[in-house]
Amino acid sequence: SVEMIETEGLQIHRYEKKSFWISGGDERNFIDPHLWLDPWNAIRMVQRISQELTEADPESAGRYQENSKFLQQKLKRLDQHLEQDLDTLKQKPFAVFHPAYTYLEKRFDLMRVGVVNIHPERPPGARHLAKLRRMMQQNGIECLFREPQFEPRLTDMLLQGTKVRSAVLD
């Protein structure tokens, strides 16, 4: 098996230690695992996978390298496309249900200012939700992004009586 986190050249982002997904005191548990959401990280990961497959199966090296090159080109085009499409959104604050998009946000200078559910195993408390609601109003947040696998009831309740829209990010 290959540990992608050890791939040379990756941009690595860490959670705050007081945040979540902490177990056993292992420093690696503070690393945000959503590495691929930065297209340049994804490119480095594709290169690493191709390299590992080539070493394990040299007879198929040409096919691995060809597939790697093709996917890297697609990821570079995706990066350019996202850079253009997200450029107008750089100064627009938003909130997310779950803090899974840090790599995307940092790569494209997006302005996340709030998170509904910080810990995946525990629902947020009333104090956190009240604070988030005030922050959304004070910062002029227009959109809260949620994910399809999470029940929308919590975000619907949070946004009730506000002008903040909800959209699904998948």
Description of each model-found segment:
Residues S1-D170:
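Extracytoplasmic metal-acquisition and chelation regions
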